[in-house]
Amino acid sequence: MKIGLALAGGGIKGAGHIGAIKALKENGIEIDCVGGTSIGSIVSALYAMDYSTDEMLRLFKYFAKDIMKIDPKYYWSNVKSKRNFMGYGLLSGERIEQAIAECAELKGLKNIKDIKMPICMPTTEITESKKYVFTNQETQDETKQIEYINDIPLGKAVRASASYPGVFAPTVFKGHKFVDGGIFDNLPTHEVRKLGADKVLSIRFSSEKFYDPKNLFEVALKSVDLLFDQRTASEVASSDYAITLDLPEANVFNIKKIDYCYNQGYITTLEHMAEIKEIFKEK
């Protein structure tokens, strides 16, 4: 039996995915294929490249601190061209691409098709209003409602899946403009099944239902999160088992809560371990 792991988007909360993976590995639950959206694509890529959970956590912390820095060149290019920041994003997203590319290079990898473990990461083509999926498998959609790309630098693919609207600029690749995959598919359960998984374990985050936005930017982020949460619900229902990580002390961009999210991901997954072993016991 092949086990697939689907990881939802959720910003800094994605550290919880790493804690969950640690708990799974410690209990002998071996994953055969993986898929993730937005921050889930970052964790999926690191996992598929065979980084340990300790290495993943260290890299995650490094990414979080570096990625959220304003790039002066990008900032002033927007100012000089009078470009609308909310239309393009406060950050370029180049640091995400560079960081993943460096991690891939250390493993002798470059392109998504270089990864041995089956992997997928959804994104959104903003001009076409269409779902795209980056994968190292030969996948097609006969309905043409979804497009698949299996030849793209890994860093570029992750950046495209994680280009959170209004925060990161769209990722441009071969004439396409890609933004966060959560708009169409924030928890890629169905896509992980297409990788060959017999059963899929999904990990998502509870929504901040009572969070009170304090400014226009927070209102925009909350609105996007509500959209993503709605997209996640149907995918949870199609999972063989789903873990919901409740992280009330964290929000999407609070980098001070990385360890908290990681620890809660680990603890929560251990609490579900008896059920997980029962469902995924045949390997």
Where are the predicted features?
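Patatin-like phospholipase
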Residues: M1-T37, A45-K283
